[in-house]
UniProtKB/Swiss-Prot annotation:
Keyword Transcription: yes
Gene it is expressed from: nodD3
Protein name, per record: Nodulation protein D 3
Domain annotation HTH lysR-type: ranges: 6-63
Protein source organism: Rhizobium leguminosarum bv. phaseoli
Record's keyword annotation contains Zinc-finger: no
Length: 302
């Protein structure tokens, strides 16, 4: 089919090349022969009057023009797949569906580990990419690059549906021999101590505790920034640093790592972890089933 002189099948080829960055792999992913894919590249170059890709070894490197085109093409194809083409029947125990989930390691060990255990029994063909949180999760959802985002709703866009999963609260931890934690911390002590903090993405986006502390006028003297909660203990051991982290996470750490816990100097509010999915996936039977599993397992958390 042509639209204003463009064979729309070529957009599928361009999208595959943007994903795979390799001619053979892209051809295989959309069931084309390599000669047919090469012909598609020639036609794309002719239509857009741009090279679109340059070769670096066997890798196809997109030009700026291809980078500009890719998001709109991906979104258009996603819309067709999810809203025009009929949904396939979804049978969990027979499915080989692959889900991409953006989340932090705290949610991985507290919640998603239980989901993985359950699905290994009930739907063993289901697979996952568990991806770190990024600077712009809304863009990932809009393009359909992830199936789910799990984070506090504060950091979610209003453009996509979401549902709450569980509540969590924050506590302070330090090395077990940190003498300053033998008594309750004052606000002044908390502010003057060295802190280890978690930041997400290349631009080190703030976390929920940053927002709470800012609301209460508390500042931290940050000495160490890490990219995941699992790195916090290493930043605390043998020092007088402290960290403000989710309480359930401390419960997992304390079985193997000598930490001391104390309450923050002010009563920080609880926060919510929610799951969000692309609006285009809202009626996808597999997506509906997966988010139901998440809600069920979250309800079982202690």
């Amino acid at each position: 089919m042509r639209f204003k002189g463009l064979d729309l099948n070529l957009l599928v080829a361009l999208d595959a090349l943007m994903i795979e960055r390799n001619l053979t792999a892209a051809a295989r992913s959309i069931n084309l022969s390599q000669p047919a894919m090469s012909a598609a590249v020639r036609r794309l170059r002719s239509y857009f009057r741009d090279e679109l890709f340059t070769m670096r070894g066997r890798e196809f490197v997109p030009t700026p023009r291809a980078e500009d085109l890719a998001p709109a093409i991906r979104e258009a194809l996603q819309h067709i797949r999810l809203n025009i083409i009929p949904w396939d029947k979804f049978t969990p125990d027979q499915s080989d569906r692959h889900f991409r989930v953006s989340l932090c390691d705290f949610v991985t060990v507290v919640l998603f580990q239980k989901i993985l255990e359950r699905l290994a029994r009930e739907a063993p063909g289901i697979s996952f990419d568990l991806l770190p949180l990024t600077d712009n999760p809304d863009e990932l959802l809009r393009r359909g690059d992830v199936d789910f985002l799990i984070s506090p709703p504060l950091f979610m866009s209003s453009a996509h549906p979401k549902i709450d999963l569980f509540q969590e609260r924050l506590t302070c931890v330090g090395c077990s021999n940190n003498k300053q934690l033998e008594e309750a911390l004052t606000a002044e002590e908390y502010s003057s101590m060295g802190h280890a903090v978690v930041r997400f993405g290349r631009t080190q986006q703030p976390t929920i505790e940053d927002c709470f502390l800012q609301e209460h006028g508390l500042k931290r003297r940050v000495e160490v920034v890490v990219s995941s909660f699992s790195m916090i203990p290493a930043a605390l051991m043998g020092t007088d640093r402290i960290a403000t982290v989710p309480l359930r996470l401390v419960g997992l750490f304390e079985d193997t790592i000598p930490l001391r816990m104390t309450a923050p100097p002010i009563a920080l509010p609880t926060f919510t972890e929610a799951v969000q999915w692309p609006v285009l996936h809202d009626k996808d039977p597999a997506n509906i089933w997966m988010r139901d599993i998440m809600v069920q397992e979250a309800a079982r958390l202690p």
